[in-house]
């Protein structure tokens, strides 16, 4: 299986993005299911995780069977949901343009997140989740403007 050779897998289910992770501990591997919004669910085996964790009332094992794993070149990775997941869960920096201006989302090791633009304006937030909830460009939320953005890197 994929997680035996890789440490994580990001997939899409019902337009939301999720991550399965394999982590080494003192007692062997632990497996985590990570959503953009909720606390991660962790179990001692992938089987336990798939049999005990639900997504909107559906067992994870059934979710995985219906999930899409887009190619990295697929434009779905530039959607608001994918970018928010990758920034929030994986700490990825995001570079995008909106109406001719360049913006980027960055993070510190301490967990703070920033939305900056090419005129040295910066909005600081205590977390990436807070950034995606409260950041504004021209008075609009990131979710509201995302359809007009061009993603350069995520």
Regions found by a protein language model. Give the residues of each.
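Mixed-charge, low-complexity intrinsically disordered regions
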Residues: 52, 80-89
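Intrinsically disordered, low-complexity regulatory segments enriched in Ser/Thr/Pro
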Residues: 26-51, 110-129
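Charged, amphipathic alpha-helical segments
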Residues: 1, 16-17, 73-82, 99
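Amphipathic, interaction-prone secondary-structure segments
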Residues: 3-34, 89-116
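Short, Φ-rich (hydrophobic/aromatic) sequence segments
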Residues: 1-5, 84-88, 146
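Mixed-charge, Lys/Arg-enriched low-complexity segments
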Residues: 40-79, 124-154
């Amino acid at each position: 299986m994929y997680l035996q050779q890789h440490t994580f897998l990001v997939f899409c289910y019902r337009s939301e993005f999720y991550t399965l992770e394999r982590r080494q501990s003192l007692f062997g591997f632990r497996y985590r299911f990570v959503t953009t919004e909720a606390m991660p669910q962790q179990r001692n085996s992938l089987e336990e995780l798939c049999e005990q964790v639900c997504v909107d009332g559906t067992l994870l094992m059934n979710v995985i069977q219906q999930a899409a794993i887009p190619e990295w070149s697929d434009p779905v990775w530039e959607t608001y949901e994918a970018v928010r997941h990758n920034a929030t869960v994986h700490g990825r920096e995001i570079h995008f343009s909106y109406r001719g201006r360049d913006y980027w989302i960055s993070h510190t090791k301490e967990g703070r997140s920033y939305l900056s633009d090419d005129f040295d304006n910066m909005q600081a937030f205590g977390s990436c989740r807070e950034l995606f909830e409260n950041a504004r460009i021209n008075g609009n939320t990131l979710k509201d403007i995302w359809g007009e953005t061009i993603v350069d890197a995520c």
